[in-house]
Each structure stands twice: as structure tokens, then as C-alpha cells.
């Protein structure tokens, strides 16, 4: 038992050292990037940017992402109910989850976060 504990600690130590080494290695400025850094940008067609260009996610995209995560969670919970054999034991907690999800969706529609026409 002690052997496995020492082996696990040794593995963790080696993993941590490799992780720290790579973190320092990738963050070193070796003079390669000291000049113009625009060639590293996402515009590889010769476009030289004179200012910082950032891509921001739109709020609509973020809301769509949240909807996807919540409804994916709902589907994964509901599809597993018959397979778990606990359909009637946890039915009210699943029903509460669906009601809470529906109320949240109605609040978002009411406040205008969800627009069906673009």
C-alpha cells in the first residue's frame, strides 16, 4: 500500500514539474516576437493591424449558449429517468426542475432576451 502511495506521489511530482516547465517555456520571450507581432494574428492574408483587434461574443450568442447548456442538461436528466429505475421516486424533483426551467424561459422571453426574428 505504501508502494502505491509513493508511486502516486512520484507521478504527481513528475507531472507537476513537466507542467511548470512547459508553462515557463511557452511564456518565455526569446526575442522572436520582439518586433512586429501582427504576423501572429488571425489575419494571415497580409493584413497588418495597427491596433488591438478582439472578437467579442454577442450577447445573443451567449444566451443561445446558456440555453443549449440548460436544455442539454434537461435532456440528459430526462432520458436517464427510465434507465435508472427511479422514475417515480424522483419525479417531483424532475418536475420541479422543469417548472423552474420553464419559468426562467418565460422571464427571459418577457424581458426581451429571446428574439425570434433577426
From Swiss-Prot:
The keyword Transport applies. It comes from the Eukaryota. Its EC number is 7.1.1.2. It is found in: Mitochondrion membrane. Pfam families: Oxidored_q4 (PF00507). It is an enzyme of class 7 (translocase). It catalyses: a ubiquinone + NADH + 5 H(+)(in) = a ubiquinol + NAD(+) + 4 H(+)(out). This is NADH-ubiquinone oxidoreductase chain 3.
